[in-house]
Amino acid sequence: MIDRYSLLRPWLFCLDPEQAHNLTLKNLDRAQRFGLLQRLVSKPIADPQNLCGIEFPNPVGLAAGLDKDGKHIDSLAALGFGFLEIGTVTPRPQAGNPKPRMFRLPQAEAIINRMGFNNDGVEACVSRVRQSIFWQRGGVLGLNIGKNAITPIEDAASDYIAAMEAVYEIATYITVNISSPNTQNLRALQGEDMLRSLLRSLDDARKRLSDRYGVRKPLFLKIAPDLDQNDIHLIADLLMEFNIDAVIATNTTISREAVTGMQYGEETGGLSGAPVRIASNIVIRALKARLGVQLPIIGVGGILSGADAREKIMAGASLVQLYSGLIYKGPDLVSECAKALRQS
């Protein structure tokens, strides 16, 4: 598939990035419906991993952001991922930021986006999840939740709780996204006082939902790469204090050091792809040093090869997630990473 994708990529890269994204997913859906995907992609790699009481068929997952609304679950699952994470979804629908809001930087194998949590709202997403064959067959599906842009940061907990309540019954795990740079003031939730308050509220809400549904769903927290050692230690300590089950490291970066002087390099938004790899690994190592074996880490950021995936595991991650690497390397990156991790 990578050879085929290398033929398609120049054509896709002539299109607006968001248009190319949507067109690719629509064609992926068509291929899946007609049974073509199974012929085009490698057979899924079996390498089971058990974390947080969840059996992951292999350690390579899809990061949130590629399928924000759960419209493409079955076709993405056919690419061989061990788990999918969809979203970010918010309690109410929102359009996100004005277009253009996604930019490619091919020289750096990077993407800048300022999407702004554009989504159809959590209820629409839940409905689509229920209709997916992947979910009906028990596939590992994470739901990534956020707050609406119009919700004051002081009231963020109410949005996260509303979204958590909506997805609780259908999610294998729930990821709390407090690290996108594209919603005003969202990263302030990573500060000590606000994070403590938010995690306390989420822990209490999860206890109520566990009683209601008779099952305790794992809660993950997704953090930024733009944190210093003290920030990382503080977050790690709060994760343990408030019973968060895992941490996803990391989201996109606001740093532009690696893309200075490049076309679109100064666009506002989060930078992903190859330039975030080292920063993500630094955060993973710092988290591992603080958390030890008490809380697992999911590594994401700059994985464009099997070697990059192994590097995340060596840094301290237990699982990895892909997004920007798929844009540059194509769907066979999934099996490449899964094979590399099985052999390591």
From Swiss-Prot:
Cofactor(s) the protein requires to work: FMN
Main enzyme class: oxidoreductase
Reactions listed under catalytic activity: (S)-dihydroorotate + a quinone = orotate + a quinol
Membrane topology: Peripheral membrane protein
Pathway noted in the entry: Pyrimidine metabolism; UMP biosynthesis via de novo pathway; orotate from (S)-dihydroorotate (quinone route): step 1/1
Molecular functions per Gene Ontology: dihydroorotate dehydrogenase (quinone) activity
Subunit structure: Monomer.
Name recorded for this polypeptide: Dihydroorotate dehydrogenase (quinone)
